[in-house]
Amino acid sequence: MSIPNEYIAKTEDVAEQVIKRGKNVLPTVARLCLIATFFEDGLRMYIQWNEQREYMDMSWGCGKFLATVFVLVNLLGQLGGCGMVMARFKVDIAVGLLFFIVVLQTVAYSILWDFQFLLRNFALIGALLLVLAEARIEGRSLFAGVPSMGENKPKNFMQLAGRILLAFMFITLIRFELSVWQVIQDIIGSILMVLVVLGYKTKLSALILVALLTILNLYHNAWWTIPSYKPLRDFLKYDFFQTLSVIGGLLMIVSLGPGGVSMDEHKKKW
């Protein structure tokens, strides 16, 4: 057992060095990845303004006015929310706005009846919770010398909920194919995701998952290789940016750590 433990220790040291060197840019990169799907969708609402209005009118029979309101709310809500998150301005309001958009689209596009897309939306909500937790941590750091008994509890539970919800994204990536590579990929990914949820070796597990998801995303969702006239391009593009947002959530875990409700934190107390 000493060899695996030594190997894990060395890997953790390498991961810590990577995190230390990138600590100044990591939160910004995490936020940028996290808002990617919202920014892309908000931009699509602008570019495909007429198509989106017609789709909503045909799907729900709600009339031109309500269809226009839906598209406008999605456009302004997502682009505005993204701008506020990146500027770190009223982050709680920005997260609430983006959360509302996720719920609105879940109902409007009948995602409730599509289990895979529903899980991905849960993962997005998890990523948003981690942004909110980061904002709480930054707020506390301004009053570092002031006692804050019990004030960290909401933040800790946000981080726990964020970790659990992010796991739903990986569930959608599990493919039940009879190939050695696919089975190995599913097993390794599942183990890493369980470790992230439990908060054990969290930063290392999340960092490896970031690398794994990035490779899978570039391989499976290479939308730029598909001609623009093919519907598959839009589907892969949607998939690509949603996965990128979850990668942003994992990077946020790498930056913040697992929080108080985790095995890593309990180990420190032991």
Curated annotation (Swiss-Prot):
Instruction: Write out the GO cellular component annotations.
Output: endomembrane system; endoplasmic reticulum; endoplasmic reticulum membrane; endoplasmic reticulum-Golgi intermediate compartment; fusome
Keyword vocabulary terms for this entry = Endoplasmic reticulum, Membrane, Protein transport, Transmembrane, Transmembrane helix, Transport
What the entry says about domains is: The di-lysine motif confers endoplasmic reticulum localization for type I membrane proteins.
Query: What's the protein here called?
Result: Surfeit locus protein 4 homolog
The GO annotation for biological process reads:
Golgi organization; protein transport
Q: Which cysteines are joined by disulfide bonds?
A: none
Q: Which domain of life is it from?
A: Eukaryota
Instruction: Please give the PROSITE patterns that the UniProt record associates with this protein.
Output: SURF4 (PS01339)
List the ranges annotated as motif Di-lysine motif. Answer: 267-270
Where does the chain cross the membrane?
Answer: 65-85, 93-113, 115-135, 178-198, 206-226, 243-263
Its function, per the record, reads: Endoplasmic reticulum cargo receptor that mediates the export of lipoproteins by recruiting cargos into COPII vesicles to facilitate their secretion.
InterPro entries attached here? Surf1/Surf4, Surf4
Q: Which family does it belong to?
A: Belongs to the SURF4 family.
- Which Pfam families does this chain map to? SURF4
In the bilayer, the protein is annotated as: Multi-pass membrane protein
Question: Where does the protein end up?
Answer: Endoplasmic reticulum membrane
